[in-house]
């Protein structure tokens, strides 16, 4: 996803409020744990993109931020929402550097849920863990991981170890944990 961002000068509450009122989202780009730049993201463009994403996919989406004539590859590390309107009010981006490891959550998609044996027998499929925490290089980031649940019967489970994890990803979450279960209704 490409975003054109502009620089902003200050962290004063009154100016941040003004940015939000004029259709912007205050944001910060971090690099190596330190603040690299204070920026403004177009609220309309970002909200439209956010609404088109599948649930959980934001954590593994790589953004190309066009900033002062250069392009910065980054992940959203934190997002803040307004309490009542649920509008995005602040973003934190983490710059991706080729040779540096990054920690992130990659969403888990259950595939073949319609053909699941346990569901056909009247069970209920429940996804216990929706994302796997991993460490990897930016080039190894994948949008999601798949877990096939077709052969899952009643009262059976699938663990994180049943997921085919690409070579460059190193899981942080223990793989012995249950990811999906089919229970009797």
Curated annotation (Swiss-Prot):
Disulfide bonds: none annotated. One of its GO terms (molecular function) is structural constituent of ribosome. InterPro entries: Rbsml_bL25/Gln-tRNA_synth_N (IPR020056), Ribosomal_bL25/Gln-tRNA_synth (IPR011035), Ribosomal_bL25_b-dom (IPR020057), Ribosomal_bL25_C (IPR037121), Ribosomal_bL25_long (IPR001021), Ribosomal_L25_dom (IPR029751), Ribosomal_uL5_bac-type (IPR020930). GO terms for cellular component: cytosolic large ribosomal subunit. Keywords: Ribonucleoprotein, Ribosomal protein, RNA-binding, rRNA-binding. GO terms for biological process: translation. It comes from the Bacteria. HAMAP family: Ribosomal_bL25_CTC. This is one of the proteins that binds to the 5S RNA in the ribosome where it forms part of the central protuberance. Part of the 50S ribosomal subunit; part of the 5S rRNA/L5/L18/L25 subcomplex. Contacts the 5S rRNA. Binds to the 5S rRNA independently of L5 and L18. PANTHER family: RIBOSOMAL PROTEIN L25/GLN-TRNA SYNTHETASE, ANTI-CODON-BINDING DOMAIN-CONTAINING PROTEIN, RIBOSOMAL PROTEIN L25_GLN-TRNA SYNTHETASE, ANTI-CODON-BINDING DOMAIN-CONTAINING PROTEIN. Belongs to the bacterial ribosomal protein bL25 family. CTC subfamily. This is Large ribosomal subunit protein bL25.
């Amino acid at each position: 996803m490409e975003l054109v961002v502009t620089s902003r000068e200050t962290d004063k509450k009154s100016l941040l409020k003004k940015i939000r009122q004029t259709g912007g989202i205050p944001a910060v780009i971090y690099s190596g744990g330190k603040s690299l730049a204070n920026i403004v993201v177009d609220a309309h463009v970002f909200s439209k993109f956010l609404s088109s994403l599948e649930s959980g996919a934001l954590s593994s989406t790589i953004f190309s931020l066009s900033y002062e004539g250069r392009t910065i590859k980054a992940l959203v590390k934190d997002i803040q929402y307004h309490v009542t309107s649920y509008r995005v009010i602040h973003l934190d981006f983490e710059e991706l550097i080729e040779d540096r490891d990054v920690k992130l959550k990659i969403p888990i998609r259950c595939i073949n849920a319609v053909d699941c044996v346990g569901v056909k027998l009247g069970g209920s499929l429940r996804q216990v863990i929706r994302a796997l925490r991993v460490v990897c290089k930016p080039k190894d980031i994948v949008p999601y991981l798949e877990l096939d649940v077709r052969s899952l019967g009643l009262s059976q489970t699938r663990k994180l170890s049943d997921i085919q994890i690409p070579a460059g990803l190193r899981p942080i979450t223990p793989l012995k944990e249950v990811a999906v279960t089919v229970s009797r209704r």
